[in-house]
């Protein structure tokens, strides 16, 4: 297991680029999927109740995807702000370094693995 350490300036700059790219991708995803998450309209040309149920299931899945994308986008924005403030890479809960491997996999991660596990258990 990786021993968490503070990030170098080069690592921070690389992760900043990753965060900016991810931010653009999530924004585009939210815009592209906005229609799918809107309320289901009754389609008189569709066949029966099954079509409406399927449409509502599709809407629920789209809404869940939108919520996840919005959360990740907020985390990206918070991480970019943390870079500006000089606190990026530190766990928001215990204030220890998050770890380079974790940040490369999920650059918007606000917590170290231990604290994330504790948050997930709630």
Which sequence ranges carry the predicted segments?
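Residue-level signature of catalytic and energy-coupling elements of molecular machines
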Residues: 19, 94, 103
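Cys/His-enriched microdomains
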Residues: 89-92, 110
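Cysteine-rich micro-motifs
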Residues: 109-117
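Short, cysteine/histidine-rich loop/knuckle motifs that typically chelate Zn2+
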Residues: 93-94, 114
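Cys/His-rich microdomains that often coordinate metals
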Residues: 98, 119
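Interaction interfaces in information-processing and related assembly proteins
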Residues: 1-85
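Short Cys/His-rich "knuckle" micro-motifs
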Residues: 101-105, 122
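Residue-level signal for mature regions of secreted extracellular proteins and peptides
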Residues: 84-87, 105-108
């Amino acid at each position: 297991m990786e021993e968490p350490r503070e990030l170098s300036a080069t690592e921070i700059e690389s992760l900043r680029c990753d965060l900016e790219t991810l931010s653009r991708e999530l924004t585009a995803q939210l815009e592209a999927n906005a229609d799918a998450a809107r309320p289901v309209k009754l389609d008189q040309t569709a066949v029966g109740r099954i079509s409406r149920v399927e449409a509502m299931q599709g809407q629920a899945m789209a809404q869940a995807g939108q919520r996840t994308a919005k959360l990740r986008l907020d985390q990206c924005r918070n991480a970019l702000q943390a870079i500006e403030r000089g606190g990026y890479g530190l766990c928001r809960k215990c204030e220890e370094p998050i770890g380079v491997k974790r940040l490369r996999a999920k650059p918007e991660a606000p917590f170290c693995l231990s604290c994330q596990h504790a948050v997930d258990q709630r």
